[in-house]
Amino acid sequence: MNRRLLASVIACFAIASVGGILAQGPAAPAAPGGRGGGKGGQRPGNPATPEDLADIAKLPNLPALGQGAGDGDFSVGPDYTPAPEEKQRVGIPHGKLIEFFMSSSSSKVFPGDTPFERLVSVYIPAQYVPGRPAPFIFSADSYGLQGRQLANILDNMIADRRLPVMAAVMTANGPGPERSLEYDTVSPVFADFVENEILPRVEKETGVTLTKDPEGRMTYGGSSGGAMALTMAWYRTERYHRVLSYSGTFVDLREGPGAPHGAYEYPEHFFPDNPVKPIRIWMHVSENDIGATSASADRRNWVIANQRLAGVLKAKGYHYQFVYAKNAGHVDSKVIHQTLPQALEYVWKDYPISGK
């Protein structure tokens, strides 16, 4: 099998794994590798309390997400239509995709229990001027690669001057329990891995120059990848100011010394107890997301965790947009297909666009 075909297989598997397997049901999955870094697994859940259900019952009544909506809480669904920006258009410049592999055996941070090859796919817009630092998106699980989804969106929205001329770095996760180690660990380790190992290789392999300006850097992911996106910006705010998350795993999935309740620390302690950081966030959760009927006290209800995080962001005065998806599941593809262009436009609001 040649490397390009292998790249496509790996990318499709990664996207299917997150957008399909994890979307199947409301029961919380076992933490890959166990909670607390490998010392446990799924714990039995308690049913949601009347108070929990009353909080969740408010979400379907949120105002509909309209074009150009600002900060706040919104809803979409129950019916969905793919955004026209996903379709490839004729008569506009089309960017290119460059793919390469990184061997885990050469990594100082994530060598893997078993060596593996990590696919890295890079979108470079046709309008990119060599040598000029480009703003960029860093996405988990190769999000946006399948069917050139993100490439088409960026082609169209850059041409329409709705987004700046930007690159996208779509990186596959490590296999098996490696994914949870990388994404669910609440620490700066993964962000530093990206900065010191992935991004230098991207510049070397593609010739693109990536901006160092945190205003020009966005992280993007779903499920554990959504938690990773926020973790990168939280711990390395000097590098990232923009975050986009679908069904973010802001729950007690992988505990650590600095986060005894895993990513649930974000709504529970990190955001409430710290000064406001210059982070702009778009976040989503679905009606039938993981743990939607479990007790908030278990810290394993994705709906309540995201709802509470949104509440804290509002109280602290963050620029954020929280979207509740009716008739949808975990990292539901129909939600992404409808909302991603508008989410990108919100996250990149106020960033300079040439010619606008």
PLM-predicted stretches and their roles:
Residues 1-5:
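Positively charged n-region of N-terminal signal peptides that target proteins for export
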Residues 8-20:
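Bacterial N-terminal signal peptides
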Residues 32-356:
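Non-catalytic cap/lid and distal C-terminal segments of serine-dependent acyl enzymes
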